[in-house]
């Protein structure tokens, strides 16, 4: 990595976020998922991922990255989506927004219009969350799971929390927030971007994107206990995000309960420390970019990665102020998500079916088989261990060799 400093932008990056005009679509108008009772074993080249006659029309763009045959070192479709209308999978109109797992045999994927599914190491099973809203965040707890759509409620499974309604057929219950800070928290002026929490913590952090930069805070905390309804409370002093670029956030991640990273519009990067205390601290960092940062992954307490529009990739290795610029990135498309198993095994996904891999020295573009002429936007990636990668996006979910 080559480290260069843009001193002229340091003060600006710490002072406030810059509004950009466009973000990735989250599929709010797409169709709902089918009933939750269907279970099937994935195959490498079946379902919605098989090319249609329309896919075969026209010339092949970047053919070398899109072979017809699935091999062990190539990403391939892994079932889950249904292009035939038989009801055996998610509609290909759905987008996967987030993938998270506890292990190779316990993986969840969530997305547009209530799309939600679980992989048990062998097969995918659709799970009905109840509300058919776009799901933007997914937390795996000890025990239970939480998914988030709108900024006014949570949807939980396996959590003993007060105020739950009747469960869905998938075992999920919806719980509205008890809002303690109505004076400052306006869910109609904010769009929920994502959520983050340590699996055992009662506190869940919410990252929001304000319609106007600096108009309201983009970081809030949700308190979840078995004895009371979920309560949304202030995480930072009022108007903090007028001075620090935290009003238009898009992604969060951390490796320990006490600290995490949040990134967003205008190249914003902030680090929250003492995250479990009543008085957390927030520090702005210099990303050396004004591009929107749309994904972040924390490798360790001393290393993290973030990705964004126009092929932006930044790497943090402990500097007190500045993130390094990744120099040999082989694309300029918008990038949405980053994950890995270590600093030498990092995966990034984005527009035009672009998947990148970093081996500790160089970035390379990965091949995808079985797409025909399709070049779907890829918006989610999660890695359980080296060689076991899940990638999701518009009407597709992929794995190496099409295998778990």
Task: Place the predicted regions along the sequence by residue.
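Metal-dependent phosphoesterase/phosphodiesterase active-site architecture
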Residues: 16
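Residue-level hotspots at or immediately adjacent to binding/recognition sites across diverse folds
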Residues: 25-30, 34-404
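Bacterial N-terminal signal peptides that target proteins for export
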Residues: 1-13
């Amino acid at each position: 990595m080559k480290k260069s400093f843009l001193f002229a932008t340091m003060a600006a990056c710490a002072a406030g976020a810059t509004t950009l005009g466009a973000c990735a679509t989250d599929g709010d108008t797409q169709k709902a998922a089918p009933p939750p009772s269907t279970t099937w074993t994935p195959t490498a080249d079946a379902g919605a991922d098989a090319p249609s006659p329309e896919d075969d029309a026209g010339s092949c763009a970047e053919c070398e990255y899109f072979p017809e045959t699935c091999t062990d070192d190539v990403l391939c479709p892994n079932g889950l989506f249904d292009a035939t209308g038989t009801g055996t999978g998610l509609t290909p109109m759905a987008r996967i927004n987030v993938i998270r797992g506890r292990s190779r045999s316990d993986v969840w994927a969530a997305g547009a219009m209530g799309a939600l599914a679980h992989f048990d190491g062998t097969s995918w099973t659709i799970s009905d969350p109840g509300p058919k809203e776009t799901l933007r965040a997914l937390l795996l707890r000890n025990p239970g799971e939480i998914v988030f759509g709108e900024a006014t409620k949570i949807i939980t499974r396996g959590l003993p929390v007060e105020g739950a309604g009747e469960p869905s057929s998938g075992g999920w219950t919806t719980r509205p927030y008890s809002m303690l800070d109505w004076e400052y928290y306006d869910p109609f002026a904010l769009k929920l971007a994502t959520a983050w929490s340590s699996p055992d913590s009662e506190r869940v952090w919410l990252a929001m994107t304000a319609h106007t930069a600096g108009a309201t805070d983009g970081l809030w905390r949700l308190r979840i206990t078995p004895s009371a309804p979920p309560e949304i409370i202030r995480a930072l002093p009022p108007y903090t995000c007028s001075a620090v670029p935290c009003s238009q956030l898009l992604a969060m991640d951390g490796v320990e309960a006490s600290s995490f990273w949040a990134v967003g519009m205008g190249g914003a990067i902030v680090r929250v420390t003492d995250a479990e205390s009543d008085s957390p601290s927030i520090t702005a960092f210099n990303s050396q970019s004004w591009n929107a940062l749309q994904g972040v992954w924390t490798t360790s307490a001393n290393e993290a990665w973030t990705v964004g529009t126009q092929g932006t990739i930044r790497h943090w290795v402990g500097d007190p102020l500045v993130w390094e610029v990744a120099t040999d990135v082989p694309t300029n498309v918008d990038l949405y998500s980053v994950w890995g198993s270590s600093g030498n095994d990092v995966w990034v996904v984005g527009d035009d079916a672009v998947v990148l891999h970093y081996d500790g020295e160089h970035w390379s573009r990965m091949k995808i088989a079985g797409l025909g002429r399709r070049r779907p936007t890829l918006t989610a990636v999660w890695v359980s261990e080296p060689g076991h990668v899940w990638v999701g996006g518009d009407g597709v979910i992929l794995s190496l060799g099409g295998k778990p």
